[in-house]
A protein has these predicted regions:
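Alpha-helical scaffold segments in soluble metabolic enzymes
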Residues: 8, 30, 34, 231
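Short amphipathic alpha-helical segments, especially helix-boundary/capping motifs
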Residues: 6-9, 29, 41-45, 179-184, ...
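Extended, charge-enriched "interface" segments that sit outside catalytic cores
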Residues: 50, 62, 67-72, 76-229, ...
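Internal hydrophobic alpha-helix adjacent to the cofactor/substrate pocket in enzyme cavities
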Residues: 1-19
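Mid-to-C-terminal Rossmann-like scaffold of FAD/NAD(P)H-dependent oxidoreductases
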Residues: 15-69, 73-78, 82
Length: 242
């Protein structure tokens, strides 16, 4: 947080807008948001479990998330940014290729599948379907496809993670977008927090005592976690649809 404070001190002297990292952008964003909105009575320890967005705050995509921000701050050169952009363009192109490239059934392929404890293929299979299997890795595909053999090993992990966790990542990105849209959504004045499943006891008591007007205020109450806010948001949405 010292780095962020230094950046913002310099930006304030220049009359520029503050540099703020969101919870969905970096763990330091989670740390600062927790300290500012919730406070703490003891040393704060940043653990991955504190972030509700840890699926998208991964080590392998840190450059994709933060290089554009660093470039805006003048800390990342044009050349470095273009390398990062090129890297993830290549990853996306490879995923698209895996979707449209099939591998025929063969004794060698089925022997591999059997040895890994997964079902054989009898009519061939798209490469991406094989990679989605938990038992297989991208490197396993290199023996059956020239394109995979030619693909840079340094990028293979990013392809594998994107493919294997595609559904979970897409769901979390949708949660980020939805929560941003509903952050200022009003909370009914007559809401009964005792009826909301998923709220922890501490959160229920704090919300009932403070009576926040919207979800943004609720999320900034000490003792109310992002999971509590998500439960509250789901409850309000369900009542609106009734």
């Amino acid at each position: 947080q010292g780095f962020v404070a230094g950046v913002n001190a310099a930006r304030k002297l220049k009359g520029e807008t503050p540099f703020i990292l969101g919870r969905e952008q970096a763990y330091i964003g989670t740390l600062i948001d927790d300290l500012v909105t919730k406070g703490t009575n003891e040393p704060y320890r940043m653990m991955t479990s504190r972030s509700e967005y840890r699926l998208i705050l991964r080590q392998d995509n840190a450059d994709e998330r933060l290089a554009p921000i660093g470039h805006e701050l003048g800390l990342v050169s044009d050349e470095t940014l273009q390398k990062v952009v090129g890297k993830y363009d290549a990853v996306r192109r490879e995923i698209k290729r895996l979707e449209h490239t099939g591998v025929p059934s063969s004794d060698a392929l089925n022997a591999l599948l059997t040895s890994r404890g997964t079902a054989e293929v009898h009519d061939g299979s798209p490469l991406i379907a094989l990679l989605r299997r938990p038992q297989l890795t991208y490197d396993d595909l290199r023996d059956f496809d020239a394109g995979c053999r030619a693909f840079p090993p340094a990028l293979a992990e990013s392809v594998e993670i994107a493919v294997k966790y595609e559904g979970y990542i897409r769901r979390q990105m949708a949660e980020v977008a939805e929560f941003a849209r509903l952050e200022h959504r009003a909370i009914p004045e007559d809401i009964d927090y005792a009826k909301i499943d998923g709220l922890r006891l501490e959160a229920r008591e704090k919300l009932a005592a403070i009576r926040p007007q919207n979800l943004g205020q609720a999320g900034r109450i000490s003792g109310v976690s992002p999971a509590d806010v998500a439960a509250l948001m789901l409850y309000i949405t369900s009542k609106t649809q009734d």
